[in-house]
Amino acid sequence: MRIPICLLAIILAGSGMATAQVSPFVEYGATVHTGDNIPLWQVSNQQGLGSIYDNTYIRGGLGYKHRLGKWKFEEKLDMVAAVGMNFKGDKDIFIQQAYIDARYKWLGIFAGSREKGAPLLNNALSSGDMTWSGNARPIPQIMIGIPEYLYVLPRFAIKGEISYGWFTDNKYQERKVGAGHWYTKDIKYHHKEGFVRVGVPNGKWQLDIGMTLDTQFGG
């Protein structure tokens, strides 16, 4: 235990720099039920940290934001130790989030797995859209694009991104489906989206229109 504490102390000591911000965190959660399964809304929108079985978990990690010249960087590592998350009574340790996000002016470059919700929706109230929700663990991917609205005209802004990634559920499918049944391994992931915004910046009324595409391929 001494080594992690010492390392954390060193990182926190360096967070006093004007351009750096360190954010350590720890979280504990548990869900129990008396019926056949956990109620739907106690499982939904949990970014994969929910289960129809009784479950408990502890998670912790470290976020780091800093600047390097005109570049802005954000890194994060988030790990989870859980019981009953995938199968009844099973024990698992996994990485929930691990990513680096780099921004230069309007350009964004991202690599890793990060929790995200559906665009244009209030993810605290919604169960997701037709292609994306907050019900599964993040998908590792590499992305490039314009992550925030960029005004190209006084009342017209654009944003968009494209990414490629891969699913990490091979072992889950092997245990869930079992031998003698068909299932696909090593599936790849592709995402792209584009949006336009019409309206006065920071005005009371703005119109957002766009399209998203999420696909599976390979395997």
Give the residues covered by each predicted segment.
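Transmembrane beta-barrel strands of outer-membrane/channel proteins
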Residues: 24-36, 75-85, 102, 109-115, ...
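Residues that define the transmembrane beta-barrel architecture of outer-membrane proteins
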Residues: 52-60, 91-96, 135-142, 186-192
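Extracellular loop and loop/strand-boundary signature of outer-membrane beta-barrel proteins
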Residues: 45-49, 82-86, 127-132, 177-182
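Outer-membrane beta-barrel translocator domains and adjoining extracellular loop/strand segments
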Residues: 37-43, 91-94, 121-128, 170-179, ...
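Transmembrane beta-strand segments of Gram-negative outer membrane beta-barrel proteins
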Residues: 20-60, 69-83
